[in-house]
Amino acid sequence: MFDVIVVGGGPTGLMLAGELRLHGVRVLVLEKETEPTRQSRAQGLHVRSIEVMAQRGLLERFLERGHTVAVGGFFAGLATSWPERLDTAHSYVLAVPQVITEQLLAEHATALGAEIRRGRALVGLRQDEDGVTVDLADGEQLRARYVVGCDGGRSTVRKLLGVAFPGEPSRVETLLGEMEMTASQEELTSVMTEVRKTQQRFGAMPLGDGVFRVVVPAEGVAEDRTASPTLDEFKQQLRAHAGTDFGVHSPRWLSRFGDATRQAERYRVDRVFLAGDAAHIHPPTGGQGLNLGIQDAFNLGWKLAAEVDGWAPEGLLDTYHAERHPVATEVLDNTRAQIQLMSTEPGPQAVRRLMAELVEFENVNRYLIEKITAISVRYDVGEGHELLGRRMRDLALKHGRLYERMHEGRGLLLDQTGRLSVAGWEDRVDHVVEVSEELDVPAVLLRPDGHVVWAGEDQQELLTRMPAWFGAATAG
């Protein structure tokens, strides 16, 4: 019997598997595809996901396989510069294809002891008071104490649970693919600049070796959304919008996506959870989807591990839905707004022109970037200091950096006074006596995901706060 079965071997499922293995949880990842995807799909990590990788000691591996960029334009393609000041030590976007992200996360999870089985499709699940039985397409049955559905927008887990997935269907569709072209870079740039004055869902990005990532509006919404478009469809739509097909040829892969926006009503049904696209879908505007899923996993992983290990306080697992559902709701809303701003209709275009003026203000630009990159997220962990509920940035300490102390996925008390104690919780909370010129509060208590749940200097207040997030103290 496994502790946790993760259904889906994409970025969300693999991130979750790694988080669980940090705590010794016996985890199995079931992936229906027999081979890892060769499609680049999502193209990068935003600031909060970069911080997540840094907190687990993975960032250097990602930096070696990608490149950093500090450019704006993430909100509806509005031309903006990168803000001068962001509350982060990692003020950039990391351009790295999803295929590399999945590879690195899989290597991390398996190195920690996670088991990944490919070519295994889930067809049924049943819960009881002791665990969950899952049925596979090949007739095999497996048992686990918990199951997490990370199996995408068409999630089998969500459907088997009967969880409602309200929202709006696709009204417009976009073609996306990677291919070669005979047109020169000069011709491409000239035409693209002109077309994008009125059509934001159009572009071609060089990927190297003569390959371009091409995006162009589809003629309509396909009846069969699972069917890949043809190269002829791309050529037809390129000619319709640009007057040329740029001589595209030799496609690596072709796909389509719509602007459907939906969210699961519940992220938890007893022993089964939903994360990533299984819990929410939205257009890829702003590049938030993969990042949102990684952050779901980062929130759920330590909580589920605490439950398996037996020290989770009552109600801890319920905080997953309470914290992550509102975050996704905001993301869905901002993608809806972006889609409106990208419309070619006169009304939305007028609003877009107004927004283009507003983003020239530094505070407006920074607000939008903080929203897209998820560093403005604040969970409701109770009243008190302004830091409560916020993630702590990667502070420079007298010796090293804060995130270097969080690689093991434990809680952390950063104590600048040297007078506090975590006695009774040493098995799950590290006590770091360090000074940081960037922190203006005597001490902060961080959850394993880096969010602040206490700030101050009073030992009795700390002792009162610890059980709410780290369970009862161990007698000793």
From Swiss-Prot:
Rifampicin binds at R196, R213. Keywords: FAD, Flavoprotein, Monooxygenase, Nucleotide-binding, Oxidoreductase. One of its GO terms (molecular function) is FAD binding. It catalyses: rifampicin + NADPH + O2 = rifampicin para-naphthoquinone carboxamide + NADP(+) + H2O + H(+); rifampicin + NADH + O2 = rifampicin para-naphthoquinone carboxamide + NAD(+) + H2O + H(+); rifamycin SV + NADPH + O2 = rifamycin SV para-naphthoquinone carboxamide + NADP(+) + H2O; rifamycin SV + NADH + O2 = rifamycin SV para-naphthoquinone carboxamide + NAD(+) + H2O. InterPro entries: FAD-bd, FAD/NAD-bd_sf, RIFMO-like. The keyword Iron-sulfur does not apply. Its cofactor is FAD. FAD binds at T12, E31, K32, Q98, L122, T156, D277, L290, N291. PANTHER family: BINDING MONOOXYGENASE, PUTATIVE (JCVI)-RELATED (PTHR43004:SF19), TRK SYSTEM POTASSIUM UPTAKE PROTEIN (PTHR43004). Belongs to the rifampicin monooxygenase family. This is Rifampicin monooxygenase. The lineage of its organism: Bacteria, Bacillati, Actinomycetota, Actinomycetes, Kitasatosporales. The gene is rox.
